[in-house]
Amino acid sequence: MQDFVNRLWYPKADDCIGYRGIKWLLTPLSLLFWCVSSLRRLLFKLGIKAAVSLPVPVIVVGNITVGGSGKTPTVIYLIELLRAQGLNPGVVSRGYGVKIDGVKIVEPHLGADSVGDEPAMIVARTQVPMVIGSDRVSAAKCLIERFDVDIIISDDGLQHYKMARDVELLILDGERRFGNELLLPAGPLRELTGRQKTVDFTIVNGEAKEGEFQMILEPTRFIPVSPRSELVFEPVEHVVAIAGIGNPERFFTTLAQSGVEVIKTKAFEDHQKFSLTQITQVTGNSPVLMTEKDAVKCRDFAKENWWYLAVDAKLAENFDQRLMDKVRQVIAVKQGNRDVV
């Protein structure tokens, strides 16, 4: 199914005419999606539906396409950057695939099955205060009250207009970009490509164009998936790689570029919930390599010879200064408003 969707949304020159036919059959549904989503955004823009402003700056990290683009590494990068500048950031997120009544604090010991894979990964890596819930405003208020954060990052929050934002970061896959440039379901877009012109920063995971900031995901080391394992990874000839992320081919390419010889790859659905049986049916007893996001879902049952590849985001040199200039402006305005009150 995932391969079919990818070929529909990200067509190649040699794709058969059948894919083009399906695309046009889905276009009326895309038009309906555009009407509903555009009306919703317009209501917030006109003030008919009120967006809630918070007393601290809000940085939104998101995209206008479905699937992986590098949002989670970007969030981790921002956490470390803001901390280095003396700020106390917190993160809010939906918690994909998790049913929550109200809001939930993401504790380091909680697994991906109870908080979602991205929140589990972010907190495991950074120990940042993080709250998840469908109502991001309530989640943000919880962060401020419980953890005294002075700046909030909204993970995958570009389309959540109920919470007012001060800085918008659009994350874009440099290889896929906007695909066939059609809205869901005929294409991968959540919003039209013109939305890019309204954000403060566009960060491209890969080759950037003029006015965009390039991000490189730099592999750092292979880490055992199991917290009980101390086995060091050594490249061997029978490694199997698996990935349950939005763009698994990017991960497999990264492994190849790192000099790892992989005899077999298996792409699962994004946000795949794994089991030991499911993975070993693919890998047998072979050494396994996976992404960090997948690893947080496999820790409880991982074998000793399973590792994940940790990556760090590296952004264009001028990005940090440009972002912090914007953040300081927002802080000054919000502090001024509090002084007036």
Curated annotation (Swiss-Prot):
GO terms for biological process: lipid A biosynthetic process; lipopolysaccharide core region biosynthetic process. ATP binds at T65, V66, G67, G68, S69, G70, K71, T72. Its EC number is 2.7.1.130. Keywords: ATP-binding, Kinase, Lipid A biosynthesis, Lipid biosynthesis, Lipid metabolism, Nucleotide-binding, Transferase. Coiled coil: none annotated. It comes from the Bacteria. It holds the Pfam family LpxK. SUPFAM superfamilies: P-loop containing nucleoside triphosphate hydrolases. It is an enzyme of class 2 (transferase). Pathway: Glycolipid biosynthesis; lipid IV(A) biosynthesis; lipid IV(A) from (3R)-3-hydroxytetradecanoyl-[acyl-carrier-protein] and UDP-N-acetyl-alpha-D-glucosamine: step 6/6. GO terms for cellular component: plasma membrane. It catalyses: a lipid A disaccharide + ATP = a lipid IVA + ADP + H(+). Transmembrane segments: none annotated. GO terms for molecular function: ATP binding; tetraacyldisaccharide 4'-kinase activity. Belongs to the LpxK family. Transfers the gamma-phosphate of ATP to the 4'-position of a tetraacyldisaccharide 1-phosphate intermediate (termed DS-1-P) to form tetraacyldisaccharide 1,4'-bis-phosphate (lipid IVA). PANTHER family: TETRAACYLDISACCHARIDE 4'-KINASE, TETRAACYLDISACCHARIDE 4'-KINASE, MITOCHONDRIAL-RELATED. HAMAP family: LpxK (MF_00409). This is Tetraacyldisaccharide 4'-kinase. The lineage of its organism: Bacteria, Pseudomonadati, Pseudomonadota, Gammaproteobacteria, Alteromonadales.
